[in-house]
């Protein structure tokens, strides 16, 4: 059996003061809407890490037959995720104290306020509920064959391709860089937003930190003019 390479990216949320609405359930589908008083988000990419405090807000978890989606809206901190399941087996989502949901995935999409990151990587999503009104959401992303990202201003998007060979042995090829002139979105403190942190501080796709601007994650956002 082929062994997996070590995880190269971790995204972890710790959300405190959780209040949950009654779960909405259908066959092979659950949805939970929650509010939180505060929390933090930690990103670890290789030897680099970044931690941000998240203010009061809300989040939604939708757990379906083939996709699990998360939407976190904490004011200036907004992001949504969609994970494509890697296995046919499915465990229902619950918010009972001490419950844990583990979802292996084979691809994921992450959308911020102004950019979208799409990866054909595999990994594991874990959602756990503590007994003290605390929720933990952890994403472990493994080395993917391809990473795709674009700024939602589609008129500025440019294209580059990261080959599997560059990922498996980046030292044998020159890194590929997209033109970053149109990719200047930053946090209010002058630092890069968390999606840019993932792109610039990792070698997920064998480019040693280049932002790869590819076709939109959602075709309806394309500018056809």
Swiss-Prot record:
Main localization of the protein described in the UniProt heading: host cell
One Pfam family from the record: Herpes_UL4
Locations listed in the record: Host nucleus
Keyword Repeat (UniProt): no
InterPro entries reported for this sequence: Herpes_UL4
Keyword field: Host nucleus
GO CC annotations on file: host cell nucleus
Similarity comment text for this entry: Belongs to the alphaherpesvirinae HHV-1 UL4 family.
Protein name: Nuclear protein UL4 homolog
């Amino acid at each position: 059996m082929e062994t997996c390479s070590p995880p190269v990216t971790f995204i972890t949320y710790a959300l405190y003061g959780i209040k949950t609405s009654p779960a909405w359930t259908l066959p092979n589908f659950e949805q939970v809407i929650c509010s939180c008083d505060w929390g933090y988000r930690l990103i670890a990419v290789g030897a680099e890490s970044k931690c941000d405090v998240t203010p009061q807000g809300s989040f939604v978890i939708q757990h379906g037959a083939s996709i699990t989606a998360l939407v976190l809206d904490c004011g200036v901190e907004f992001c949504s995720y969609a994970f494509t399941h890697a296995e046919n087996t499915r465990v229902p989502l619950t918010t009972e104290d001490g419950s844990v949901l583990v979802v292996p995935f084979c691809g994921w999409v992450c959308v911020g306020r102004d950019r979208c990151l799409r990866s054909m990587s595999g990994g594991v999503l874990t959602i756990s509920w503590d007994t003290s009104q605390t929720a933990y959401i952890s994403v472990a992303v493994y080395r993917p064959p391809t990473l795709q990202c674009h700024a939602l201003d589609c008129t500025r998007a440019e294209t580059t391709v990261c080959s599997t060979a560059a990922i498996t042995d980046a030292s044998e090829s020159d890194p590929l860089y997209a033109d970053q002139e149109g990719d200047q979105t930053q946090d209010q403190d002058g630092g890069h937003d968390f999606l840019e942190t993932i792109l610039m501080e990792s070698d997920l796709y064998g480019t040693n930190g280049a932002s790869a601007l590819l076709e939109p994650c959602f075709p309806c956002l394309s500018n056809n003019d």
